[in-house]
């Protein structure tokens, strides 16, 4: 008859479970801090690169965390990507009216030949700035 003592294996299993729970808490804290840093830097970048007219985009930069996932985004702001990446030259035509008019225009017009807009990145630079720090903190937190 062969008898196998698995008590040490059970102890090791409990250790691994405890260790993984501790690591998960550390990782969640690192994610939270990095998401907040990216959000803060993105808002700062918007101000620095002159993208703030009304403050709507700046107020729309938010972070969201669930479990082991964190996102930094501009929710419900349709023009956010256009500020980040710029636009090509395009024609603007009225959707519901016969002509376009804006404050300061001398008269209504049927279309506008928009020259496009230069990219003013704010979110990607904030992410790229934080990434090395995030990876370093993650490496320090998870001891192999």
What are the roles of these predicted feature ranges?
Residues 1-80, 93-144:
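Short, Lys/Arg-rich flexible segments
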Residues 90:
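Short, His- and charge-rich active-site/binding loops that engage polyanionic ligands
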